[in-house]
Amino acid sequence: MKLYLASKSKFKSQILDKVYINHECIDVNVKEESTKTNAHEYVMELAKLKARHGATMVSDGLILGLDTVVLMNGKIIEKPKTLEEAKENLRKASNNKVSVLTGISLINLDTEEAFTDFQETKVIMNEITEENINYYIEKEKDALYVSGFVIETVASCFIQSIEGSYYNILGLPVEKFYQLLRKMNLDLKDID
């Protein structure tokens, strides 16, 4: 069975590659807006929207839709549109607790089964000096993604501790993906 990742995100695709899950990326290009104010419902609604849109682009297989946001002081921190917004997100995160929420939606086009859930990871941040914020923005070419935090590079130095899924912070909680796959009575070996 073919797996389609409803995203052109190189980060998400690399995660699937790292855990040896064959897949094909499809560009769903949906407007990331939700009517939900609850962050958990928000990410699940957008993940479902992406998966459903992806389902209109192929005729069979599995469609995986994902949406990740950072929640800080009870507010959703969206992907920054400018480098200044990315800097501001880092300033707010300094010496703070943040939650990374990912909505995950899996559709089996062969059986018409669909499951949607979310994963939450709590992150405690170290102090981030203005000099280090500028250094990070200068070095990190992908700073305009995932609320400005690219944990695999310099931003990893800013993290004091993580409670929950590391892969969730990267945008694809493989543990939750596996759980949804098992709900469909499928195994990793079923994906080709």
Predicted regions located by residue number:
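Residue-level signal for inorganic ion chemistry
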Residues: 16, 47, 67, 86, ...
